[in-house]
A protein has these predicted regions:
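Two-component/phosphorelay signaling modules centered on CheY-like receiver
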Residues: 1-14
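Residue-level signal for the "D+5" position in two-component response regulator receiver
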Residues: 15, 40-43
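Acidic catalytic/metal-coordinating carboxylates
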Residues: 18, 44-47
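Active-site beta3 strand of CheY-like receiver
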Residues: 29-35, 40
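Alpha4 helix (beta4-alpha4-beta5 surface) of REC/receiver domains from two-component response regulators
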Residues: 47, 69-86, 96, 100
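Hydrophobic/aromatic residues positioned on beta-strands within the core alpha/beta folds
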Residues: 64-66
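Receiver (REC) domain switch/active-site region of two-component response regulators
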Residues: 90
Length: 111
């Protein structure tokens, strides 16, 4: 559902169902933005972000952290995540966050 929503807005979307698949996708191409669910099968989204940053040193890739956990804000702060969305979330909230973060990254790249 998430990828369909973002594709409708014109974004190229790559999905992964677990941490190892996500890391393999990042090896092929570093994303412009990541939407990461804190609760992933086997390993969690926090582990993925730590490993992603350790391997590729890409602190400038914006991240939206999805979680039903009330601790998501603390986790996001600890990981340097730009934005969080509670689960369940409204599609329009995700769209606004993605648009804002993509625009911010583009303006930084141009300066």
């Amino acid at each position: 559902m998430l990828h369909v929503l973002l594709e409708q807005d014109g974004h190229a979307v790559v999905t992964a169902g677990d941490v190892q698949s996500a890391l393999a996708q990042c090896k092929v191409q570093i994303p412009d933005l990541m939407v990461v669910d804190l609760m992933l099968p086997i390993e969690d989204g926090e582990m993925f972000l730590r490993e992603f940053r350790r391997r590729w040193r890409q602190e400038d890739v914006p991240v939206i952290l999805l979680s039903a956990s009330s601790a998501r804000t603390d986790i996001a702060r600890r990981l340097g995540v730009e934005a969080t969305l509670p689960k369940p979330f409204f599609a329009e909230d995700l769209r606004e966050l993605v648009s804002r973060l993509v625009a911010q990254r583009a303006s930084v790249a141009m300066s």
